[in-house]
Amino acid sequence: PAGLTDYILVEDRLTVEIIPDGVHVHPLLVEKTLRCKGLGRVAFVTDSVLGAGSPPGVYDGLYAGARVEVTPDRGVRRIPDDALSGSAMTQLRCFQQAVRRFGRSIPEAAALCSRTPARVLGLNDQGVLDRGMRANIILLDRELNLKMTILDGEIVYRADEPQR
């Protein structure tokens, strides 16, 4: 019998939000969802906790004062019960996953990580590079490393400048 997942995959009025870390949702289900829903109905998102982007290791205070382990795949698990407690995955890492793990092109990854989430949130002046849109832009190198961040047309981060 069909279940809720099957309904979600075929219902065109629904947009699916996925954390593409391989922990929250199995990679095969991510790929199945991408193929069934298409780029306009899948948004790559994160439920990152304080300390997002932290390297693997054990930390105190990242999540509700609990001791947690950031795993190599950027999942966050509580110690000692090993419960999944969020992610240390950034939105940039979602973009990198779209390209590297799921084989999507740069424009497709931008749709998954920017255009579709902005549409879902009703942010009609964001999510794409076009005239009249907010100039919120990240610049990446060929290896998809962050080189520059521009918010509302102002450079707020440059990888080649010392950070305060």
Name what the model sees in each region.
Residues R119, V128-R164:
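C-terminal cap of metal-dependent C-N hydrolases
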Residues G3-G22, L29-T46, L50-M133, I137-L140:
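His/Asp/Glu-enriched, well-ordered alpha-helical/loop segment
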Residues V23-H24, V49-L50, L144-N145, V156:
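Short, glycine-/Ser/Thr-/acidic-enriched flexible segments
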